[in-house]
Each structure stands twice: as structure tokens, then as C-alpha cells.
From Swiss-Prot:
Residues 1-6, 82-90, 150-184, 261-264 are extracellular. It comes from Rattus norvegicus. Pfam families: TAS2R (PF05296). Residues 28-60, 112-128, 206-239, 286-308 are cytoplasmic. One of its GO terms (molecular function) is taste receptor activity. The chain crosses the membrane at residues 7-27, 61-81, 91-111, 129-149, 185-205, 240-260, 265-285. This is Taste receptor type 2 member 41. SUPFAM superfamilies: Family A G protein-coupled receptor-like.
Length: 308
């Protein structure tokens, strides 16, 4: 029997996931419709479509995984369904991190203003590289998934054998594998996109600082369109940075700390794990004129439906 606190946080988790699924689904539908109509997408829309799709699938699979683990704790450890779910989750986690990184790089390249030849070359070439970067991210995620699958399959086979050297129990052996294999693998495979993400934001902050210094003697600097564009993008990226960092840290902690479903902190921890992919889509929608207009119309229609 779940406690009142657990039921409360479980309800928040379900609501958060459904809102994220709706927001990511909205982005995917909008961009898919545009792709069908025009036959092509802008580089930024390609990244947003990829990011929205991976997050949509990640939340659906994560929702199933959280409840399956909570309701069938004993069966979860020895079920083949765990390997299947982990296979999808590992791929989607890696792909989502990479797609989010390319989004931050695109922000930096489009808005930042540097005269370095390497940056100018990247600004010129990046739009054409986006499809290949997305395909490369999928390939890297597939390779990472295979490495995680090997570890998960080893755990499953060990659980069936129950034979270990010395007096080691399965729980102790599994714990050692988590620390010696899964955690280093997660750190290595996520540190590269996370580093690129941080570099992009730092470059954008530096560009904004330099632009502000050049415009500080201009009485209309606050109304300057470029300054306003920098400020809006910076606020969006800072919020993305906080959510991205929270997602990264929580994922690393999740690899080392196992919280059982009967623990009172299980559902609050699930909320933290899925917070970024649920909140950030709404930030993207509110900062995108095309998304914002359609989303506002849908909200008005929904409001009118419930009022009547």
C-alpha cells in the first residue's frame, strides 16, 4: 500500500510526464506537418524535430518503466522486459543528450558574433552539417546502447546463475558492476555532449557581454533588436543549462544510487529525472513565434470547450 506522500508525488510525476508528452508531441506534429507540406526543414527545425521525437519516446518508455518497476519489483529484476526497456532507455538517453547539444550549438552559431576564421567557417558550414550530425548522433547512441546492453545482459545472466566467487551476494556483485562499469560508461558517453553544450553557452555569454559593451553608450541600446535577441536567447539557454545540468547530474547519481520503489523518495526522484524533458519543451514553444501562435490557439479552443 502506497503512502499518502508517495501517491502525491506519483500524481505529480504522471501529470509532469503527460504534459511533457503533449508538449513534445505538439512540436513533433507541427514540424512533421511542415516537413510534409514543404518537403524540407530548416536546420533548426531538424534538430527540434529530432529532440522532440526522442523526448516523446523517452517519456513514454520511462512512464512504463517507472510503473512496471514500482508495481512488479520482484519480477522486474528477472524479467526480459527489463532488458528491452533498458535497451530503449539507453538509446533515447544518449540521443536526447546529443540532440540537445546540437540545439545549443545552433543557438551559439546563429546569435554569437565572432570574427575568428574557425567560427566563421563553422557558421557557414554548420547548416549543411546538421543532417550528418544528427545521423552521427544516432549512430553513436546505437553503439553506446550496445555497450549498456552487454552490461545489462551480464546482470541478467548473473541473476539467473546466482553463483559468485567467495561470499559475494548478487546485490554486492551488481553494486560493484554499477560503480565499475555503468557509471564510468555513462560519464564518458555523456561528458562529450555536455562539454560541447557548456562551451556553446559560454561563447554566447561572451558574445552578449561584448555586444553590450559596444552598445553601452547608445541611449537606445536596450531597444536594439540584436541586444534583445541576445537577451532572449541567453535566458532560454540559461534555463536549458539548469535543466540540462540537473538531468546530467541526476542521471549520474541514478547510476550509483539505487532507490527502491518502496522508498518514499522513489517518486520524487522520478520527477527530478524527467523534469528537463517535460519543462524545456514549453520553453521552446514560448520562445518560438510559429509554435507560440498555434499553441495559444489550441489553448483557447480547449478553454472554450471546457467552459461550454
Amino acid at each position: 500500500m502506497l503512502s499518502t506522500v508517495s501517491v502525491f508525488f506519483m500524481s505529480i510525476f504522471v501529470l509532469l510526464c503527460f504534459l511533457g508528452i503533449l508538449a513534445n508531441g505538439f512540436i513533433v506534429l507541427m514540424l512533421s506537418r511542415e516537413w510534409l507540406w514543404r518537403g524540407r526543414l530548416l536546420p533548426s527545425d531538424m534538430i527540434l524535430l529530432s529532440l522532440g521525437t526522442s523526448r516523446f519516446c523517452q517519456q513514454c518508455v520511462g512512464l512504463v518503466n517507472s510503473f512496471y518497476y514500482s508495481l512488479h519489483l520482484v519480477e522486474y529484476s528477472r524479467s526480459l522486459a527489463r532488458q528491452l526497456i533498458s535497451l530503449h532507455m539507453d538509446f533515447l538517453n544518449s540521443a536526447t543528450f546529443w540532440f540537445g547539444t546540437w540545439l545549443s550549438v545552433l543557438f551559439c552559431i546563429k546569435i554569437a558574433n565572432f570574427s575568428h576564421p574557425a567560427f566563421l567557417w563553422l557558421k557557414w558550414r554548420f547548416p549543411a552539417l546538421v543532417p550528418w550530425l544528427l545521423l552521427g548522433s544516432i549512430l553513436v547512441s546505437f553503439i553506446v546502447t550496445l555497450m549498456f546492453f552487454w552490461g545489462n545482459h551480464t546482470v541478467y545472466q548473473a541473476f539467473l546463475r546466482r553463483k559468485f566467487s567467495g561470499n559475494t551476494t548478487f546485490k554486492e556483485w551488481n553494486r560493484r558492476l554499477e560503480i565499475d562499469y555503468f557509471m564510468p560508461l555513462k560519464l564518458v558517453t555523456t561528458s562529450i555532449p555536455c562539454s560541447l553544450f557548456l562551451v556553446s553557452i559560454l561563447l554566447l555569454i561572451n558574445s552578449l557581454r561584448r555586444h553590450s559593451q559596444r552598445m553601452q553608450h547608445n541611449a537606445h541600446s536596450l531597444q536594439d533588436p540584436n541586444t534583445q535577441a541576445h537577451s532572449r536567447a541567453l535566458k532560454s539557454l540559461i534555463s536549458f543549462l539548469v535543466l540540462y545540468a540537473l538531468s546530467y547530474v541526476s542521471m549520474v547519481i541514478d547510476a550509483t544510487v539505487v532507490i527502491s520503489s518502496d522508498n518514499v523518495w522513489y517518486w520524487p526522484w522520478q520527477i527530478i529525472l524527467y523534469l528537463c524533458m517535460s519543462v524545456h519543451p514549453f520553453i521552446l514553444i514560448t520562445n518560438n513565434l510559429k509554435f507560440r501562435g498555434t499553441f495559444r490557439q489550441l489553448l483557447l479552443l480547449a478553454r472554450g470547450f471546457w467552459v461550454t
